[in-house]
Amino acid sequence: MTPRHSIAVTVQPSVEPVTLAELKGQCRVEHDADNALLVEWGKAARAMIEEATGRKLLTQTVRVQMADFPANGEPIRLPVWPVQAVTGVTYRRASDGAETALAGTQAWLDHDPPLLAPPVADGSWPFVDERYMNAVTITLVAGGTSAASVPSHAKQAILLAVGYWWGFRGDGRDPAEVQSIPGEAGLPAGCVRLLDLLTQKRYG
């Protein structure tokens, strides 16, 4: 069983699945005064959808941290997908707590879910220093390789979310309040089925 983990995106995607023009069309906005707001909301919607499904829509670097390796040499179930590459595994060595790179791991990236197996040399994970809450760090690159690879229902979910938030905007609200709308309103009910489609078929 894979230990509990934390996930952080350390390098964000360089492009977004939905363009500013598409966002403005969804919200029926013809002026440019709210361009920056709509772009930020598009990013927020993408991030919320990724968090809800575990599916990274576009190329990004992700850090996964755990307190320990799985017992008995079991593989680690990577919590995000699709995974393009595992670029590094480090751990706090049991003997002295020193951060140590682990070589020789086996990544089964086309598995559902993607798995990371221990070094083939002995088939076991090393012992870690239990004083550290995040003794194990896995760095990986995940996501689709281009905006064209993003499923249409993921793009539609982003548009639905931003359009929904736009309806909460109102007139004369404080800019700080407007910025906080995505976190307060969450994803609309119409996104639920679309998110289900994102998780029904992962590979192949």
State each model region's role.
Residues 1-204:
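Divalent metal-cofactor coordination and adjacent catalytic microenvironments
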